[in-house]
A protein has these predicted regions:
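Nucleotidyltransferase catalytic core that binds NTPs
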Residues: 1-199
Length: 199
């Protein structure tokens, strides 16, 4: 079994860490959890933040918290264009043909999942693992997903509610509430996001 967790990770924060830790708590026998940062258009990219920076920060998150068997996959970044989840999962399936795949997804996305490209094909490749449990049980799923309820699992998550975009909009003095010390240190050293930590 492997887990797939995608996102902008711009920057990686305690909410991401909570999802990762929850995955390993509920599925300790998994072979790996694969983090897949999205490709970010140069027109949307934050000032001074490169794909290399995001990959480095993800590696810092893994190492700082001693998270086992967690990898970073660059498949979407390498494409240099927007990727659809179905394309990414087909790549993962070709790379791990014998593994059961779980795709981690937030509750906001599960509510509009039927609008995703080839969502039925996604469910042929992977089971969905839903975090941020606003949906309490399978009877609360959107109507179009109820027939696939056997392919959808729920995972309790940490109480940290954050998004990378919301964090970027905060005063820098508040970033320590949402980022690990080593990531904050890296951001400061590299002068990312236009901020520097006060001395």
């Amino acid at each position: 079994m492997i887990g797939i967790f995608g996102g902008s990770f711009d920057p990686p924060h305690l909410g991401h860490l909570g999802v990762i830790k929850s995955f390993w708590k509920f599925f300790p026998e998994s072979n790996s959890l694969i983090l897949i940062p999205n490709y970010i258009s140069p027109f949307k990219k934050e000032k001074g933040v490169s794909e290399k920076d995001i990959l480095t920060m993800l590696q810092i998150l893994i190492e700082e918290n001693s998270i086992p068997n967690t990898l970073v996959e660059e498949v979407e970044i390498r494409k240099k264009t927007t990727s659809y989840t179905i394309e990414t999962l087909e790549f993962i399936r070709s790379k791990y043909p014998n593994e059961e795949i779980f795709f981690l997804i937030g509750v906001d996305n599960i509510k509009k999942f039927s609008l995703w490209k080839e969502y039925k094909r996604i469910l042929e490749i992977a089971k969905l693992l839903v975090f941020d449990r606003e949906i309490e049980n399978k009877s609360d799923l959107p109507e179009e997903l109820k027939e696939y309820s056997n392919l959808i699992l729920f995972m309790e998550n940490s109480k940290v509610k954050a998004s990378s975009s919301e964090i970027r909009g905060l005063p820098y003095s508040d970033w320590n509430l949402y980022l690990t010390p080593k990531i904050l240190e890296y951001i400061n050293e590299e002068e990312l996001y236009g901020f520097r930590s006060p001395n």
